[in-house]
Amino acid sequence: MELKTLREKSADELKAHLIDLRKEQFSVRMQQVTGQLPKTHDIRRVRREIARVKTLLGSTK
């Protein structure tokens, strides 16, 4: 998701999105461990998106 669209969301929406990203991160990690992850770049993508959301949440306080 682009930073522009993330900035338009409220803090509650960002928190909900963060929870979804954490679930996705867990799923991607489990796929990696079991050898079922065809796109290894998904790990990095999810990690960076989590960082973006957490940065925005910290700046809105």
Curated annotation (Swiss-Prot):
* Keywords (A to Z) from UniProt: Ribonucleoprotein, Ribosomal protein
User: What S-S linkages are listed for this chain?
Assistant: none
What's this protein's name?
Answer: Large ribosomal subunit protein uL29
- MF (Gene Ontology): structural constituent of ribosome
Q: Which domain of life is it from?
A: Bacteria
Read off the SUPFAM superfamilies from this record: Ribosomal protein L29 (L29p) (SSF46561)
Please give the NCBIfam families that the UniProt record associates with this protein. Answer: L29
GO BP: any one term: translation
* Similarity-based family: Belongs to the universal ribosomal protein uL29 family.
Q: Which GO terms describe its cellular component?
A: cytosolic large ribosomal subunit
CDD domains from the UniProt entry: Ribosomal_L29_HIP (cd00427)
